[in-house]
């Protein structure tokens, strides 16, 4: 099993997956990531970065952004795929650099 790390505009986090090395998405593939695949720990870390365009503030009184772009049909394009080995965890990690696909991008 491969650990998957997603990178969107410089923000990286791990997603839960059961992919094997030979089934990891390649450059040019379109992937869908449900927000439920992001652990609570990484979700909390991502919420600390309100300046990222991926997030939208609920309102100014609530001090918490919403990951509005992550839903069941959010498509992302894989721009780059790199591999590394996590010595501490003793497992292979695949880093997928992705960007959101908007209607105007098609």
List where the protein language model places each region:
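Short, well-ordered loop/turn sites that connect or cap secondary structure elements
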Residues: 23-29
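Short, basic/aromatic beta-hairpin or loop at an interaction surface
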Residues: 1-13
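Short alpha-helix capping/helix-loop boundary micro-motifs
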Residues: 14-21
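Generic secondary-structure microfeatures
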Residues: 8-10, 23, 35-37
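Acidic, low-complexity, intrinsically disordered interaction modules
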Residues: 29, 33-88
């Amino acid at each position: 099993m491969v650990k998957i790390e997603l990178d969107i505009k410089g923000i990286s986090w791990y997603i839960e997956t059961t992919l094997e090395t030979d089934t990891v998405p390649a450059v040019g593939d379109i992937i869908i990531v449900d927000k439920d695949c992001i652990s609570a720990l990484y979700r909390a870390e991502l919420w600390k970065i309100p300046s990222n365009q991926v997030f939208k503030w609920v309102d100014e009184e609530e001090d918490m952004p919403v990951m509005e772009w992550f839903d069941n049909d959010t498509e992302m394009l894989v721009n780059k795929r790199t591999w590394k080995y996590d010595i501490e965890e003793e497992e292979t990690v695949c880093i997928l650099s992705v960007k959101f696909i908007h209607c105007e991008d098609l």
